[in-house]
């Protein structure tokens, strides 16, 4: 499959002096730390029921096997699966982890609470779910704890920046499908969103999620996702978060996608056009949902993402 893009970059990259080095080719072996706990979250017998258990939230961390004191850019990736399935160890994500860590990034892949976990949700989400088709209500509700957990993972990364030598000035968040919905929300919304709606009294597991940490997202990778999470945020709370400070985004979407409609991608592109923000646009002709094997000008997704991040973040490539 190839793209019929009308040009990968709508605007030129900002003139950022290169300060952090990555490598065009694989430079190091990759060390992987699996199942690191980044926090805890509640799981209810039914949505918000008093019967609950506490679940560990886990991530895998990929890093170069080298002893340099140089700080490394960070790439957090969120798996898809309709908020009801999927895994941080999905084959394509493992490939991304090895690809980027071998070239100088610290790459993080997370698991998060899904529909079957029934994480704690704000009452206004419960009320709003009454207006969602019955077959989609669980997915709708699971969106909140998924976002909340991704937010916790970003705070964990910030809390461990010294331990892992992380350069928080070059932070990318990406995902596929449902994970891309969450990634877009993480990049566009504010740090208090998907956090302050439930208090520590109602959900004491928040104490395990480094709530004092801060961070800023510098690039978003949207693989066949949408801005649905932001739409819900605006609909329920009146928070319209798009503005001229939003980070550059790379949008990849199959033009024949019947799961997350291609119109979702064009709508997001239009948001960026309206704000005159930088983006890369890759509509994949003839592709349905999840075109992991897509190529544009002979480049796969891994290389396209590499090019986008290094250009937009002003990374020095050797």
Residue ranges and their predicted role:
Residues 266-269, 273-318:
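C-terminal catalytic histidine-bearing segment of alpha/beta-hydrolase fold enzymes
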Residues 70-82:
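Short beta-strand element of the alpha/beta-hydrolase
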Residues 13-70:
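N-terminal cap/lid segment of alpha/beta-hydrolase-fold proteins
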Residues 124-162:
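Alpha/beta-hydrolase active-site loop
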Residues 245, 251-253, 257:
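Short beta-strand/loop motif that positions the catalytic acidic residue
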Residues 89-109:
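Short amphipathic alpha-helix adjacent to the substrate-entry channel of hydrolases
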Residues 258-264:
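Conserved alpha/beta-hydrolase "acid-adjacent" motif
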Residues 148, 152-241:
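Primarily recognizes the serine-hydrolase "nucleophile elbow" in alpha/beta-hydrolase
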């Amino acid at each position: 499959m190839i793209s019929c893009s009308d040009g990968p970059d709508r605007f030129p990259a900002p003139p950022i002096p290169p300060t952090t080095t990555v490598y065009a080719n694989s430079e190091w072996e990759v060390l992987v730390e699996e199942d690191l706990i980044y926090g805890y979250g509640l799981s209810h017998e039914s949505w918000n029921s008093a019967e609950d258990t506490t679940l560990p939230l886990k991530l895998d961390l990929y890093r170069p096997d080298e002893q340099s004191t140089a700080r490394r850019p960070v790439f957090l990736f969120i798996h898809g699966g309709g908020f009801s399935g999927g895994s941080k160890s999905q084959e394509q994500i493992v490939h991304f982890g090895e690809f980027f860590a071998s070239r100088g990034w610290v790459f993080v892949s997370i698991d998060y609470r899904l529909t079957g976990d029934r994480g704690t949700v704000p009452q206004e989400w419960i009320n709003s779910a009454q207006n969602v088709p019955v077959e989609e209500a669980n997915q709708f509700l699971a969106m909140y704890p998924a976002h909340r957990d991704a937010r916790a993972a970003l705070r964990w990364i910030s809390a461990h920046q010294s331990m892992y030598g992380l350069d928080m000035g070059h932070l990318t968040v990406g995902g596929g499908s449902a994970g891309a919905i969450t990634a877009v929300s993480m990049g566009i919304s504010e740090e208090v969103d998907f956090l302050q709606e439930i208090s520590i009294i109602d959900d004491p597991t928040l104490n395990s999620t480094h709530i004092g940490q801060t961070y800023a997202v510098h690039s978003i990778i949207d693989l066949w996702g949408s801005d649905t999470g932001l739409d819900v945020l605006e609909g329920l709370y009146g928070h319209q978060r798009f503005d001229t400070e939003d980070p550059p985004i790379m949008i990849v979407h199959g033009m024949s996608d019947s799961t997350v409609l291609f119109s979702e991608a064009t709508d997001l592109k239009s948001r960026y056009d309206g704000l005159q923000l930088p983006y890369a646009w890759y509509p994949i002709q003839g592709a349905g949902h999840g075109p992991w094997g897509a190529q544009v000008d002979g480049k796969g997704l891994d290389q396209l993402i590499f090019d986008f991040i290094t250009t937009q973040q002003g990374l020095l490539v050797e």
